[in-house]
Every structure is written in structure tokens, then in C-alpha cells.
């Protein structure tokens, strides 16, 4: 639930330029996005506010936040597909992914609308350019972040992608959208992966871990912060490991530029 102070901060003649983060409560609570956007605003001397908007019902809250006058929103799990559906227009990348992580206010004669953008993929391309090239990609998960991985894979030359997920219908839809394979998560132990990417919000059980392949097997956990169980297991299996902080920082830089016109 949003506080009265947050509502008041968005109104009045002295109100700052307001943006924020919309997502599930468990994701907005631990996100570093407010800190990053705050640091960027101070660096540029901007009067700006970046607020957390924990939400269990993304579509309805997107309408309310548009009415409040926000200039833009960062969108995190589980609302990236709902945000794409709520946007009046989509960037080319957002349309290709079917999910957005950024909404920008656009004024129309009939009233304001959201335009949707996909900047997670840009964050991946900029943040992991030194991991360019992989003969096989095992991607865990089938949500909005997974779509961004497959979009970035085209530029990063991550080939032969297979989506592994518990929920078959979303995985099949994602695989069809990008022309890759989809398999049940239970089949992952039989796989060999040169690049293993987890977009899951939880750790992968040890018994489901695949075998590394190629001369330089790598594993990327899109979560960031203290070492996760996934990262520890990947190291133990022989993968070089990185977390998702570089993606977060680079997509935040792109978001800030979209919101404020400076990076």
C-alpha cells in the first residue's frame, strides 16, 4: 500500500519530477533501483523523486499511477507482461519481447497514456559484452526477464537456446515467439550448457543442475546481492559465475535517460 506522503509528493507546484518502481512487494522491497536513480538525480542536480510502488495487481495500479502524474515507471516481476498489455504503444524491442520493464508517460489529446519500452535486453548487451558468443544456451524461466535474455542473445551471439520452465504454456509461447526450443525443467539434468542463465526468483535444486559444456562454461544469475545457492552450485559444477548487477545498472542508466534526458 502506498503512503499518503507518496501521494502528496506527486502534487503541488513544488512537486519533483516523479518516477518509480512497480512490482511485487517481495521484489520492490529489495531492489537497488531507487538507490541508483537517486544517485543519478543528485549527480545531475535534478529535483526528482523515485518511489517504490509494491503492487499485487499490476494493471489496475498502472492506471492509478498514470492518473497521479508520474513521468515514468520501472517495472519488475511479476508485472512486465501486464505492463506491455497496458501500454498504448510499444518500442520495437518491447514488441519483440512481449514484455516491458519501462513505461514512459505520453500526452495525447484524449489524455495521458503509457508507452512501453524494453531496456533489460540493452542492460544485458551492455553489461555482459565480454561474454559474447556461446554455442548453447540453457535459459531457466519463462517470464519477462527470460524474454529479455532471448532478445539480447541475438546481439550477444548466444546460440542454440532452450527454455526450461515448470509452467509449460508460458515456456511454449516464449519459445515460439523467439524460434527456440522449450523443455520441462525436469529435463535440465540431461542437458549440457556452455551458457546457463537463470531468470528464476528462487534457487535451482541441486538435482536439476545441468552439466557444463565447452572450454569456458558460464552461468549468469539475473538476481544480484549476496551469493545465491544457484551461484554456489554453478561454481561447484565448474561454471564461471556472474550475477545480474551489471544488467540492473545498465538498464537503469538507459531508463534514467528516457525519463530525464540525461545519463
What do the predicted segments below correspond to?
Residues 3, 8-131, 226, 237:
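Phosphate/diphosphate ligand-binding glycine-rich loop within oxidoreductases
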Residues 23, 118-121, 128, 134-158, ...:
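Glycine-rich adenosine-cofactor-binding loop
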Residues 71, 194-195, 217:
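Conserved acidic residues
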Residues 76, 197-200, 222:
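Short, well-ordered coil/turn residues at beta-beta hairpins
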Residues 82, 203-222:
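Rossmann-fold NAD(P) dinucleotide-binding segment
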Residues 156-178:
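NAD(P)-binding Rossmann-fold cofactor-contacting core
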Residues 179-193:
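Short acidic low-complexity segments
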Residues 218-263:
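Rossmann-fold NAD(P)-binding glycine/threonine-rich loop
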